[in-house]
């Protein structure tokens, strides 16, 4: 097993390709876009956040979803229109509530592990990605949310994360630019931020240097498992191609469900839309007023990252509305309002809105490993933690592929 096809050139596809190519595999990457990281990995919140590893599978999430169903400005919005996919996903989500604590701990451990690989990849290839190693600060205005954060912190501590509670005064000292009162927060000094799109694009060049071939602007129309391997059929413009690969790794985000079905597996990913605005800090006053420490407002479900001197990313919300990439003004406006509340001297006049679909599994834990048929592997379903977890799951996936190669050679 030497020639592996990776489906998807988002952050999980690129990190997987790099992990495989680094181990001597011949790798071909397929993506429908013109460049790497053009969909969900284009303009996310920018956080590499073990501190945000809590899975959502608890009754509190269900109750909030029901309460907010008719509020178009709610942080969590569920389109009440039923579909079998949505209903089956939600049923499985509720079925995973008993696994909430175990999955939160496992996810946090994975996130901690991922950091060293992500930084190693960047160091080996040699590139910058607007990284800010200033920690991540969770802030709270609600007593209920703050109490819940204390319970979550017990789980994160079990996973080995050093995350400390800070007072309202300490919050202000950690990020002096903050202009709103809080009850306090939690600070994780080891978390950091950066530009996911810049990272993925640079790492794709590192993959190319290792011999990886990228097939951009293609449509893979058929996946066939044969005795020789996995046969892919794809079109590029008007040209049709097919090739048999020794193995395939599905890293296709929200497209993974359909691909898995074609390969005989069930991967029940649902697309959960998130929004962001990139605020262009065009004036000196805004540059001074924008924070450098990354923030997470648990109540509003908003995260921030400073991407160099001139950009400030604000992201958040979760929308269960199918395969829909519409950028809705009533979902963007709360992000602007949040900025004006927390950082009133930052001008939001020049901001770029964006929406992406997070590939969410009902367990909130990514699917990493082999499928039912030989030569089929998955690294998908990372939800809101794609970048945070990607380097660890890429290495784990490469371990599975390498083990299969050794087994086949025996």
Where are these regions (language model features)?
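N-terminal Rossmann-like FAD-binding beta1-loop-alpha1 element of flavoenzymes
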Residues: 2-29
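C-terminal lid/capping helical subdomain adjacent to the catalytic/cofactor pocket in oxidative enzymes
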Residues: 165, 187, 226, 281, ...
């Amino acid at each position: 097993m030497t020639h592996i096809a990776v489906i998807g050139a988002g952050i999980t596809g690129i990190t997987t390709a790099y992990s495989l190519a680094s181990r001597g595999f011949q790798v071909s990457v397929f993506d429908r876009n013109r460049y790497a990281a053009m969909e969900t990995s284009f303009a996310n919140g920018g956080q590499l956040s073990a501190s945000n590893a809590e899975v959502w599978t608890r009754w509190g999430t269900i109750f909030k979803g029901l309460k907010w169903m008719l509020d178009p400005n709610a942080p969590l919005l569920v389109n009440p229109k039923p579909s079998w996919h949505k209903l089956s996903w939600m049923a499985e989500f509720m079925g995973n509530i008993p696994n909430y604590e175990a999955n939160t701990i496992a996810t946090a451990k994975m996130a901690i592990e991922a950091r060293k690989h992500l930084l190693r990849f960047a160091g080996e290839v040699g590139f910058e990605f607007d990284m800010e190693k200033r920690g991540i600060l969770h802030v709270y205005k609600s007593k209920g949310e703050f109490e819940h954060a204390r319970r979550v912190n017990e789980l994160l501590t079990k996973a080995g994360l050093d995350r400390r509670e800070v007072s309202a005064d300490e919050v202000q000292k950690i990020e002096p630019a903050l202009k709103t009162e809080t009850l306090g927060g939690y600070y994780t000094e080891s978390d950091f931020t950066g530009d996911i799109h810049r990272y993925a694009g640079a790492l794709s060049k590192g993959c190319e240097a290792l011999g990886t071939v990228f097939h951009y602007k293609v449509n893979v129309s058929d996946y066939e498992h044969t005795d020789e391997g996995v046969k892919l059929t794809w079109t590029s413009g008007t040209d049709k191609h097919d090739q048999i690969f020794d193995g395939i790794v599905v890293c296709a985000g929200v497209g993974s469900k359909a691909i898995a079905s074609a390969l005989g597996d069930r991967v029940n990913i649902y697309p959960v839309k998130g929004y962001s605005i990139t605020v262009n800090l065009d004036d000196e006053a805004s540059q001074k007023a924008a924070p450098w420490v990354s923030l997470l407002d648990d109540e509003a479900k908003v995260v921030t990252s400073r991407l160099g001197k001139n950009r400030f990313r604000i992201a958040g919300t979760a929308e269960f509305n199918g395969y829909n990439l519409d950028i809705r003004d009533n979902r963007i406006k709360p992000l602007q309002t949040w900025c004006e509340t927390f950082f009133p001297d930052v001008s939001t006049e020049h901001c770029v809105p964006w929406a992406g679909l997070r590939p969410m599994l009902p367990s909130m834990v990514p699917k990493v490993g082999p499928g039912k048929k030989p030569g089929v592997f998955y690294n998908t379903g990372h939800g809101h933690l794609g970048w945070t977890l990607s380097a660890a799951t890429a290495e784990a996936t490469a371990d599975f592929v390498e083990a299969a190669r050794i087994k086949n050679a025996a």
